[in-house]
Amino acid sequence: MRNRILAVLGIIIVYRFMAHIPVPLAQPTQLKQAMNQVLTQNAFGGFLNLLSGGALVSMAIMLVGLSPYITASVVMQMLTKAIPRMEEMSQDGESGRRRINQWTRLLAFPLAILQSIAYIMILRSNLLSGTSVASSMTSTQWLLSVSAMTAGSMIAMWMGEIITEKGIGNGITLMIVVGILSQLPQTLGTIWKAMTTVNGKPFHVFNWFQINGLNHMVTWTVIILAIVSLLILYALVKVNEGQRIINVNYAKRVHGNSQYGGVTSIIPIKLITAGVIPVIFAVAFLALPAFAGQLMVATKWHSDLGRNLILWFQRGSATSGAVTGWAALIYPVSYFLLVIIFTYFYTSIVFNSREIADSLQKQGGFIEQIRPGKQTEKYLKHVVNRLTLFGSIALGLIAVMPFVAEYILSDFGMGTMASSMSIGGTGLIIIVTGALDCIRQLNSRALMVSYDEYK
């Protein structure tokens, strides 16, 4: 167990170190100054910086990150449901799953190359236009930059799989969690900057002590939001840990002088069987239209359509709503619907009612008042669908709540802090679900080993 934890920590340290190795576009200081200017003026760039775990601000080789692997996973899982041969392969035990995983890796490689080229084109033409970085790029720098970013993406994918196989928890989710947590100091700094002001008054804390130079309205807003965030965190943990227990009885069997069976076991069905994957898939899927729009504008190919895609799929807020009207609602509404769709989709992959029903029938198990076989399969599907309906709606509501907070805060002139809250909402779901998954696996592994092995 100790070796697993140390292996995970070592991989995470290397991953965060690589997130600060710049691509060979220009001098590192020149790149960082240009990207800092970009992130203060471009909302899309700020969102990409979050998803890359801060790699964008340094133009690091980990800029593309896990995005190609996530996209390839979504494509392969959709093909698994659409193509009967692949569905049979996915049900063919460990060997079938290994072949599908290998195809996913092979698909991620060309996607990483394409995304690396697209990122550089977008950054060069849109985000870094007017800077010396955009005008001094040679063909050699193009080749080296694309190669470095593709290699970084493949290394990140390999690290995630190593954590999954040799470590604790889901490696891809854990690396995304680490990337989001790395942005926490910057988010807290933004909130503190919004709270402090030159003409601020002393803020008394229960008459115990006072903090000078605070804007009272912003401070009370932050306190209220902190309380609301804790309540959302509590609700998220409850929803994630909620489950339905189905009792399974086993018929008695006599073999010689021995009697088998006659016992009762349970099938725990979680409220959100899919875990955090629907949120990750929804965020990755929603980033594609804006990404494509930026690429179209950069290449001047159907620029009007590209600008519309950027407009329609930017993160909605009260500030953008004043400019774009109904278009500001497209992102949060699409986000809510995609979370529900991907929750159902991934649940159908993770929880196979037919396999469970067949396994129970072969072992002589049955659910009370439900006949084995087809009736058991139908009953399990009914229970899972009802739980998934409630769980997906709850997860979707939690996901879009920060957008409501952003809308309210923007009315008080706190748009910058509101943007941080909106990004933090997606991050909160990923962090909580990923942490609970790690804790669950730690507990299960701790029960499987002796004291000497645990040490």
Question: What residues fall within each predicted segment?
Answer:
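N-terminal cationic and glycine-rich segments that engage phosphates or anionic surfaces
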Residues: 1-88, 95-455
